[in-house]
């Protein structure tokens, strides 16, 4: 290679390493909610109020029919309370609405444009806040909150243990520095500026709140209607131009450790632990000098018209995260000399929601870690120095199985990790579960109870099928179809849930030789794939697609180490689609022509029984063969297809919930420490739906606890960096010299 060409290649490589970080760190819009979106992207909570409020939360159909919620003619979303009915102080509380997003979101930039929020009215306690699945461990962020006649917003953080923040440059006033529960339930508090909430906010035409969440800090800005930055109105927010935040939460506390993926919640309650507790000292009418709470309830019950202004009117909410689109785009345009992309999806023991994309100038390695709880994570990219040797471990140092493959870089990288508590996790990172199809014979896919060590072989065969049926628990099941034409070996997942009760087969095997179109099928009940990868090397017009190279956002359950390989193929395609629960599944199709190889299933029902370990299938040296690792999957390729399963969105221990859109109930709750009376309310409502409990008390804090929420997506973003390692440069130099 001429010296000039070599220097050009090295120079381009070095330049790309400097350009990529800037491109990758920009915020990309990942979610917009406005108008009708609040009726589909949020669930209506109908349980007892865990803060002991004098309130009755309406379900969606009732709320829509009575006008408690509606989409206005100008496209804004209205969410109000009953302001016409006089009530008995001994009866049910005033009707209101509480909604929570059916997805969870990690770090990013969150912008809400409000036309109106509940006014400064005695007895009210409105809030826009978020909570993690496990309160207080995963944290709570109170973005907008106030009680009674408050006119200045309170921004509060809650989490577990100890979590200190210190005084930073901000326009608000830091009044409490300890966010952790060890010091009580007050949380760390910033008192906002006058007019940042309530009646003055509405009189000024509303405004915009922005929250920036990173590993190191949480910042909050409030912009009155006439002072909204142009970058926000243009849809390209520039936090560097936002100015001094109203609240800046940063200190010795590790934000990354104490605040995990959050669900966003709107509600308006009445009285309750905070508003009722301070009612008599808030300048509100007192009817019972012996009880602030009773005075609050009496006022709320007897003065419905006072609450005509107690409504939310939302223009939009936009969520931005870093790196996903920008990283892939920059990689394609600036790293022209990069010949491959390494995609590594690792199955990690439960305990992490994070997804990290590891990028180098010559090789892009995407490492995704899958939470054993139910969550789908869309990653931003946090990148480090190059290495094709990858491994993952959870916070406790638990090791994770890792599968690294290389594919030609022809696609956008959008890593997703997901897991499901509804389905048993699979072990065996080296095991393979695949289907090699294009057969003339049809594979049988019945699904009995448990099969151990089942195998099926179809060698040098024509039109013969051998089937091994394995739903509930299938260990070491394998299927091989070698040297055959149009051979098929498959591991299907949860085929419409046909699972007889207890049929146990150990060491069953079937062989069919000298047949064409041979098939061997092993069908586990509920297959969940985490970490699917695909390879297509040395091929013409080859592609590794969808959930392997661009992992589809709304894969229900968990993907662990599944891989598909298509080597030396013409027009080879490899597809890793992921369904319910498969660990270490792999498929190989070598030296084939027109060979699709895929891991994953795009349709089926998520029936969720057991687990599959070490199932494998191989189809080698065949023409027109395909290999698949199929599992059970509902609603693939759509973020919103996974039903929301957060039954109670924060403010602990609701006893029941009713989801208009969720078919699978769950238990997520949050609270400000319910009293024994609240516990009684919760018990009384226990027959209405799923429940969860938590505790929290004091002037602020909602909290969430006992969250098992199956199949609830989690979207994560992160900072994007790229370091050009010396080894990468040397590798390129060596390659160039050899060439």
UniProtKB/Swiss-Prot annotation:
Lipid-linked residues (GPI-anchor amidated glycine): 717
Catalytic residues, chain numbering: 140, 145
Listed EC numbers: 3.2.1.6
Residues annotated as glycosylated: 59, 74, 396, 459, 482, 526, 537, 569, 581, 592, 620
Membrane topology summary: Lipid-anchor; GPI-anchor
GO cellular component: plasma membrane; side of membrane
Major enzyme class: hydrolase
GO MF annotation list: endo-1,3(4)-beta-glucanase activity
Subcellular location field: Cell membrane
GO biological process, one term: cellulose catabolic process
Propeptide residues according to the Swiss-Prot or TrEMBL record: 718-739
Domain annotation GH16: ranges: 31-283
Spans annotated as Disordered: 431-718
UniProt feature, compositional bias: Low complexity: 431-442, 452-499, 507-522, 561-587, 597-641, 674-713
Keyword annotations of the record: Carbohydrate metabolism, Cell membrane, Cellulose degradation, Glycoprotein, Glycosidase, GPI-anchor, Hydrolase, Lipoprotein, Membrane, Polysaccharide degradation, Signal
InterPro entries given in the database record: ConA-like_dom_sf (IPR013320), GH16 (IPR000757), Glycosyl_Hydrlase_16 (IPR050546)
Gene3D superfamilies recorded: 2.60.120.200
Start-end of Polar residues biased regions: 523-532, 539-548, 654-673
Leader sequence residues: 1-24
Record function comment: Mixed-linked glucanase involved in the degradation of complex natural cellulosic substrates.
Record family assignment: Belongs to the glycosyl hydrolase 16 family.
Protein name (database record): Probable endo-1,3(4)-beta-glucanase An02g00850
Annotated source species: Aspergillus niger (strain ATCC MYA-4892 / CBS 513.88 / FGSC A1513)
């Amino acid at each position: 290679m001429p010296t000039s060409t070599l220097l050009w290649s090295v120079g381009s490589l070095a330049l790309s390493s400097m350009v990529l970080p800037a491109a990758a760190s920009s915020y990309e819009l990942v979610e917009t909610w406005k108008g009708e979106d609040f009726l589909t992207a949020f669930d209506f909570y109908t349980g007892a109020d865990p803060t002991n409020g004098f309130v009755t939360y309406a379900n969606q159909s009732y709320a829509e029919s009575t006008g408690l919620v509606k989409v206005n003619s100008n496209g804004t979303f209205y969410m109000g309370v009953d302001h016409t009915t006089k009530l008995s102080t001994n009866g049910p509380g005033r009707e209101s609405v509480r909604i929570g997003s059916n997805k969870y979101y990690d770090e990013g930039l969150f912008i809400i444009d409000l036309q109106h929020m509940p006014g400064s009215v005695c007895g009210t306690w409105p809030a826009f806040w978020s909570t993690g699945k496990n309160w207080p461990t995963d944290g709570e962020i109170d973005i907008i909150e106030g009680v009674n006649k408050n006119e200045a917003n309170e921004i509060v953080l809650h989490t577990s243990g100890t979590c200190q923040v210190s005084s930073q440059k901000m326009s608000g006033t830091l009044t409490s520095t300890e966010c952790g529960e060890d010091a009580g339930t007050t949380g760390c508090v910033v008192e906002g500026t006058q007019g940042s909430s309530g009646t003055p906010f509405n009189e000024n035409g509303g405004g915009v709140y922005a929250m920036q969440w990173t590993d190191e800090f949480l910042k909050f800005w409030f912009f009155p209607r006439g002072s909204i930055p142009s970058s926000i109105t243009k849809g390209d927010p520039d936090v560097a131009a936002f100015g001094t935040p109203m609240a800046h939460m940063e200190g010795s506390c590790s934000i990354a450790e104490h605040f995990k993926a959050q669900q966003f919640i709107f509600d308006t309650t009445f009285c309750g632990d905070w508003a009722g507790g301070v009612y008599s000292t808030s300048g509100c009418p007192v009817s019972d000098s012996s009880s602030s709470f009773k005075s609050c309830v009496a006022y709320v019950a007897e003065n419905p018209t006072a609450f005509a202004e107690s409504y939310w009117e939302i223009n939009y909410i936009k969520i931005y995260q870093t790196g996903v689109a920008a990283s892939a785009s920059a990689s394609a345009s600036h790293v022209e000399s990069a010949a491959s992309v390494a995609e590594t999806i690792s199955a990690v023991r439960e305990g992490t929601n994070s997804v990290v994309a590891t990028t180098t100038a010559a090789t892009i390695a995407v490492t995704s870690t899958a939470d054993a709880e139910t969550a789908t994570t869309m990653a931003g990219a946090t990148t480090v120095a190059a290495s094709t040797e990858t491994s993952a471990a959870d916070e406790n140092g638990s090791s994770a199985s890792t599968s690294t493959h290389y594919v030609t870089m022809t696609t956008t990288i959008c890593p997703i990790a997901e897991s499901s508590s509804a389905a048993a996790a699979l072990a065996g990172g080296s095991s393979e579960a695949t289907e090699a199809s294009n057969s003339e014979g049809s594979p049988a896919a019945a699904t009995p109870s448990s099969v151990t060590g089942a195998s099926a072989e179809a060698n040098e065969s024509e039109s013969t099928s051998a089937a091994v049926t394995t739903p509930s628990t299938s260990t070491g099941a394998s299927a091989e179809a070698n040297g055959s034409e149009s051979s098929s070996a498959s591991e299907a997942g949860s085929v419409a849930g046909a699972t007889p009760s207890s049929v146990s087969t150990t060491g069953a095997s079937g062989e069919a030789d000298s047949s064409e179109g041979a098939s061997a099928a092993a069908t586990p009940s509920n297959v969940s794939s985490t970490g699917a990868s695909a390879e297509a090397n040395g091929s013409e017009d080859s592609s590794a697609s969808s959930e392997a190279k661009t992992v589809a956002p709304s894969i229900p359950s968990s993907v662990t180490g599944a891989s598909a390989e298509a080597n030396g193929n013409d027009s080879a395609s490899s597809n890793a689609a992921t369904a319910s629960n498969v660990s270490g599944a792999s498929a190989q199709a070598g030296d084939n022509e027109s060979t699709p190889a895929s891991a994953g299933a795009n349709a089926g029902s998520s029936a969720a029984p057991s687990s599959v370990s070490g199932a494998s299938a191989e189809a080698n040296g065949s023409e027109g063969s395909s290999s698949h690792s199929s599992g059970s999957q509902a609603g693939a390729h759509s973020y919103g297809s996974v039903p929301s399963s957060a039954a109670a969105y924060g403010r602990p221990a609701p006893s029941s919930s009713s989801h208009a859109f969720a078919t699978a109930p769950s238990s997520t709750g949050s609270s400000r420490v319910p009293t024994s009376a609240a516990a009684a309310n919760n018990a009384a409502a226990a027959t209405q739906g799923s429940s969860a409990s938590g505790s929290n008390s004091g002037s602020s804090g909602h909290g969430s606890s006992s969250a098992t929420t199956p199949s609830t997506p989690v979207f994560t973003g992160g900072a994007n960096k790229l370091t050009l390692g010396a080894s990468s440069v040397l590798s390129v130099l060596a390659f160039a010299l050899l060439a």
